[in-house]
């Protein structure tokens, strides 16, 4: 059936700030849906509080609301925009829960808005554990034995019946939040209590343990004609007990027989029909008992999910785009497959390669928390690799994670390695090293329950390592040898380690033997039809499937896996660069390994290489494509680290030169440059060794800010207040950071106000694009501080000085593109802290706040355009106050105190916009899920809060200065760092831990008291006159 014509305006709900369990995959799916629906002529309205996304760019939707994802704000948008329908299946759990709240409040009925994609009943059946179990029973699909309970009394009663271990799964939560596996009665009580609290409907499912079973997922799509297709099967390398988001996964499933696969397929078809997902995609998870083949369904997500993004990238089938079109009435057989152009979307994808996904973790950011993986997701990003075999795919995925830690494991004894066989991020490395040492597959299977087939495959890689030494001198290897070795996924660097040569020596010998990769195409049909979308991966075979063109080409390096400190903001910058260069007439080539992102969509760049971001893999592409330029400064630290090596090998790096990058990143040369320019710096020195650091600290005095060269996200950065603290810090930093980094010791400017300045420079002229004032004082990482643009608390004279000095610095360095500079203002003097001649994480926020696409301009500068040609010759004036606030993942890391410091810990951000800076701050807080109360009790702990107390009392809150028994307040402001902060966080009470944020919070509450908080689209804001600033 053709698309519905009774719908004119469709409201899409986004997913809000990036958080663990809900990351960049929803920017990718939302962006696809926006393009698809607008392409069909619908008016599309988007609400999403996350400015770091492509989907919230003003030209993607007809009206974009950077507003909190709360029922109150969305109702105001519905009243204003009068949508005919809401599509809630593309914004993760946040959007589904919000749709249900709007239904329950009567908002949908009041305004006559229809839910499309998934109806209320389907969402309830898919998400409510009790209803799901009943539905499965009805169609004869087995679920784990279990019971839904709504109180501790019920839970204790049922636990007696089912025993231990026991799985606790709260209803309607994200990424397994609040759940877990209890092995002891004490754990059972603690997890269940937390789960009941975290579930918005106060219910948890208690289930029999299926630890150690094999886990599979099927990605399923259905249309209103009841055509159901399977996009792909996905197998979890890690057995049951590890959240699928934290597990290594493989597509297609490797260890299922055809009969077993058909059984899961048939059950999936029955499940999606019974749940009632009439249109769109669902992800269905199964567990299979390896001993007897018993199959149970674990759960389904009646929406586009993290696995959908992986399945899309693994197969080339655009699940989110097709889901959006099915939601407006199309049938699968009416939609063409973009890649083949001859097959309809009702053809199930078929693939002739293997895809491996490996998650990326950030436990090093949260010392003291356990790295034991369970049913609560804790990874912050992921990589994907494609190979012709599992072995090739696994080795490529391992090197894509950028955590080259082979040496660490080689030095461990066997007892230490065996101690790492519990579910944790390092288990795969321990398994590999133990196999290297001769551990048996049976012993490893007993310890890990990782399927023997996977262990056999890894053992074959290890056997090949031994065989390499028997092939004779590497200089005499024939092409056939090289081909067989490389088809197992071995990198030049790893071959070099084994045979005792450098990576560059191996590369030269390999090229001399004419052993270079060919590039295959991801085509959805296992090469049965011609593919029109150039989406490629490398392997070592005969036939190359890349067809060249005569257009000048530019390679843009992506940012690899998301992590704390290098998130979706850098993907945003690389996508903008692609668009700008396409407009300028270049053929764009994207290289990236992250399946969650817009940059790795098959129709973003002219050509996509899904490859690891390593010197070897990137240089192979440069050799193959012969581009006129390679852009490294938009993808964060990952491509920057490759810049010098690529340039030395002949890659034409364009934009800011590797020499400039080095001059700004290397602390000693940067300090000398600032002295030459007469820029004030905190007193500081660079130490090359721990001994020198101790000596310099004694000269400078404490407190000091200590930071290593070449790090992102404040990695290993700390405020040290005594020699003892410094000694401990040095021991830790030399253990945690690769190589022997030089360390900058700076006088710490206690209580200074920090500024972030983003600048564009074309080599002849520099223009500051935006100056952000931090809410938090110096000492809190810039990525964890809220910030406001334009600044509120600084004089015009000081801002003019900062602007002029920043522009002088950019010109002196020879920046060609973007530069971010951080300043600290104390007693009327601005001190320069650091300069980064690259895109910073504030680029998307500033681009929206000042209505200028900074990353697009940086890309145009890289290919020779001037700021004058671009049309940016002076600092743009902001039409509104914009506040960026961060989302912090403390809840996922038990026992960690939610206190901010110089090491970055946030995973995402929200944006608030208003004509009043304090109302913009209030909106940003709500957008980051910190729901500041406008009434009730505020508990203030610590000195220096009298002004805050007075403001809150004036706003009508009851202010108390000590805790009333065990009763928690409605707002906790605690600058003493007490354990109450953690307790309040776990109970959902908004917390503030610094005096600076407390001042802003109190003023925001007072401002919100007397305001209607009207909603206004970003497009509308950007057309008005500038605010003062």
UniProtKB/Swiss-Prot annotation:
Domain ATP-grasp: 133-328, 671-863
Stretches the record annotates as Allosteric domain: 930-1029
All residue ranges annotated as the MGS-like domain in the record: 930-1028
Cofactor note: Binds 4 Mg(2+) or Mn(2+) ions per subunit.
Binding site for Mn(2+) 2: 299, 301
Origin species: Deinococcus deserti (strain DSM 17065 / CIP 109153 / LMG 22923 / VCD115)
Chain segments carrying region Oligomerization domain: 403-544
Keyword Acyltransferase among UniProt keywords: no
Domain comment, as recorded: The large subunit is composed of 2 ATP-grasp domains that are involved in binding the 2 ATP molecules needed for carbamoyl phosphate synthesis. The N-terminal ATP-grasp domain (referred to as the carboxyphosphate synthetic component) catalyzes the ATP-dependent phosphorylation of hydrogencarbonate to carboxyphosphate and the subsequent nucleophilic attack by ammonia to form a carbamate intermediate.
HAMAP family for the chain: CPSase_L_chain_B (MF_01210_B)
Catalytic function, reaction form: hydrogencarbonate + L-glutamine + 2 ATP + H2O = carbamoyl phosphate + L-glutamate + 2 ADP + phosphate + 2 H(+)
Required co-factors: Mg(2+); Mn(2+)
SMART domains given in the database record: CPSase_L_D3
Annotated protein name in UniProt: Carbamoyl phosphate synthase large chain
Pathway connected to this protein: Amino-acid biosynthesis; L-arginine biosynthesis; carbamoyl phosphate from bicarbonate: step 1/1; Pyrimidine metabolism; UMP biosynthesis via de novo pathway; (S)-dihydroorotate from bicarbonate: step 1/3
Family listed: Belongs to the CarB family.
Residues the record lists as binding Mg(2+) 2: 299, 301
Keyword Magnesium annotated: yes
UniProt keywords, alphabetically: Amino-acid biosynthesis, Arginine biosynthesis, ATP-binding, Ligase, Magnesium, Manganese, Metal-binding, Nucleotide-binding, Pyrimidine biosynthesis, Repeat
Enzyme class: ligase
Domain of life: Bacteria
PROSITE patterns to which the protein is assigned, alphabetical: ATP_GRASP, CPSASE_2, MGS
Gene Ontology MF annotations: ATP binding; carbamoyl-phosphate synthase (ammonia) activity; carbamoyl-phosphate synthase (glutamine-hydrolyzing) activity; metal ion binding
């Amino acid at each position: 059936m053709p698309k519905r014509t009774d719908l004119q305006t469709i409201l899409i709900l986004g997913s809000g700030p990036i958080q663990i369990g809900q990351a960049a995959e929803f920017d990718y799916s939302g962006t696809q849906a926006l393009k698809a629906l607008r392409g069909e002529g619908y008016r599309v309205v988007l609400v999403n509080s996350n400015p770091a996304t492509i989907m919230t760019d003003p030209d993607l939707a007809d009206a974009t609301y950077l507003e909190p994802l709360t029922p109150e704000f969305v109702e105001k948008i519905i009243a204003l925009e009068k949508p005919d329908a809401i599509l809630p299946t593309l914004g993760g759990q946040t959007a589904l829960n919000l749709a249900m709240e709007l239904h329950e409040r009567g908002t949908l009925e009041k305004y006559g808005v229809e839910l499309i994609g998934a109806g209320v009943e389907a969402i309830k059946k898919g998400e409510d554990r009790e209803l799901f179990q009943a539905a499965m029973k009805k169609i004869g699909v087995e679920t784990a034995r279990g019971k839904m309970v709504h109180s501790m009394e019920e839970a204790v009663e049922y636990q007696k019946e089912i025993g231990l271990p026991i799985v606790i799964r709260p209803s309607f939560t994200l990424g397994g939040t609040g759940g877990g596996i209890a092995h002891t009665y004490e754990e059972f009580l603690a997890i269940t209590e937390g789960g009941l609290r975290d579930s918005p409907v106060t219910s948890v499912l208690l289930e029999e343990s299926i630890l150690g079973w094999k886990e599979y997922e099927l990605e399923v799509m259905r249309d209103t004609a009841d055509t159901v297709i399977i996009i792909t099967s996905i197998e979890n390398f890690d057995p049951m007990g590890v959240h699928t988001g934290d597990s290594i996964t493989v597509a297609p499933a490797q260890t299922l027989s055809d009969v077993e696969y058909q059984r899961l397929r048939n059950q999936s078809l029955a499940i999606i029909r019974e749940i009632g997902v009439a249109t769109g995609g669902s992800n269905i998870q199964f567990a299979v008992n390896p001993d007897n083949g018993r199959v149970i369904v674990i759960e389904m997500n009646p929406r586009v999910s993290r696995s959908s993004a992986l399945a899309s990238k693994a197969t080339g089938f655009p699940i989110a785009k097709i889901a959006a079109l099915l939601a407006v009435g199309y049938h699968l057989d009416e939609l063409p497959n973009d890649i083949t152009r001859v097959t309809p979307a009702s053809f199930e994808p078929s693939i002739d390669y293997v895809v491996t996904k490996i998650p990326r973790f950030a436990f090093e950011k949260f010392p003291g928390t356990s790295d034991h993986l369970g049913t609560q997701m804790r990874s912050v990003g992921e990589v994907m690799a494609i190979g012709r075999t599992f072995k090739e795919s696994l080795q490529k995925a391992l090197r894509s994670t950028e955590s080259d830690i082979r040496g660490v494991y080689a030095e461990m004894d066997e007892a230490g390695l065996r101690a790492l066989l519990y579910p944790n991020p390092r288990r795969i490395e321990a398994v590999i090293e133990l196999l290297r040492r001769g551990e048996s597959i049976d012993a490893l299977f007993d310890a890990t329950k990782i399927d023997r087939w996977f262990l056999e495959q890894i053992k074959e890689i290890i056997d090949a390592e031994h065989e390499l030494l028997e092939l004779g001198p590497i200089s005499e290897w024939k092409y056939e040898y090289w081909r067989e070795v490389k088809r197992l996924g071995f990198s030049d660097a790893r071959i070099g380690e084994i045979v005792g040569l450098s990576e560059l020596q191996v590369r030269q010998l390999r090229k001399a033997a004419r052993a270079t990769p060919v590039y295959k195409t991801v085509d959805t049909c296992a090469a049965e039809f011609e593919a029109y979308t150039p989406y490629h991966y490398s392997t070592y075979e005969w036939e190359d499937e890349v067809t060249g063109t005569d257009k000048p080409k530019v390679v843009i390096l992506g940012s690899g896996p998301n992590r704390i400190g290098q998130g979706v903001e850098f993907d945003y910058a690389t996508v903008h660069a692609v668009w700008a260069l396409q407009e300028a007439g270049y053929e764009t080539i994207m290289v990236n390994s992250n399946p969650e992102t817009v940059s790795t969509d098959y129709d973003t760049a002219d050509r996509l290489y899904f490859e690891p971001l390593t010197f070897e893999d990137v240089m192979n592409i440069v050799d193959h494509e012969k581009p006129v330029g390679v852009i490294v400064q938009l993808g964060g630290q990952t491509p920057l680290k490759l810049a010098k090596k690529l340039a030395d090998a002949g890659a034409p790096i364009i934009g800011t030169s590797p020499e400039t990058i080095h001059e700004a990143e290397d602390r000693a040369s940067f300090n000398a440059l600032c002295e030459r320019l007469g820029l004030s710096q905190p007193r500081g020195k660079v130490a090359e060794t721990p001994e020198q650091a101790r000596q310099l600290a004694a000269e400078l005095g404490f407190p000091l800010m200590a930071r290593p060269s070449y790090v992102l996200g404040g990695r290993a950065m700390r405020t040290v207040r005594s020699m003892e603290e410094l000694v401990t810090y040095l021991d830790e930093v030399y253990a945690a950071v690769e190589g022997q980094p030089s360390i900058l010791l700076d006088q710490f400017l206690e209580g200074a106000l920090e500024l972030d300045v983003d600048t564009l420079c074309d080599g002849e002229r520099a223009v500051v694009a935006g100056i952000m004032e931090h809410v938090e004082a110096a000492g809190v990482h810039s990525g964890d501080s809220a910030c406001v643009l334009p600044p509120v608390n600084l004089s015009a004279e000081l801002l003019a000085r900062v602007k002029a000095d920043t522009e002088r610095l950019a010109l002196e360095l020879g920046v060609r593109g973007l530069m971010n500079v951080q300043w600290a203002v104390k007693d009327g003097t601005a001190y320069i802290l650091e300069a980064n001649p690259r895109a910073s994480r504030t680029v998307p926020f500033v681009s929206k706040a000042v209505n200028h696409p900074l990353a697009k301009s940086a890309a145009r500068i890289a290919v020779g355009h001037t700021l004058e040609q671009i049309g940016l010759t002076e600092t743009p004036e902001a039409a509104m106050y914009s506040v960026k606030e961060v989302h912090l993942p403390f809840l996922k890391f038990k026992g960690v105190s939610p206190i901010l410091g110089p090491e970055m810990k946030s995973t995402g951000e929200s944006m608030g916009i208003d004509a009043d800076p304090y109302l913009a701050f209030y909106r940003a807080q709500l957008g980051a899920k910190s729901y500041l109360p406008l009434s009730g009790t505020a508990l203030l702990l610590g000195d220096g809060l009298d002004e805050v107390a007075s403001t809150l009392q004036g706003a009508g809150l009851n202010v108390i200065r000590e805790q009333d028994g065990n009763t928690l307040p409605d707002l906790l402001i605690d600058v003493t760092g007490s354990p109450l902060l953690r307790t309040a966080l776990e109970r959902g009470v908004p917390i503030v831990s610094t005096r600076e944020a407390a001042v802003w919070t109190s003023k925001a509450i007072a401002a919100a008291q007397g305001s209607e908080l009207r909603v206004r689209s970003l497009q509308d804001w950007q057309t008005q006159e500038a605010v003062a600033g």
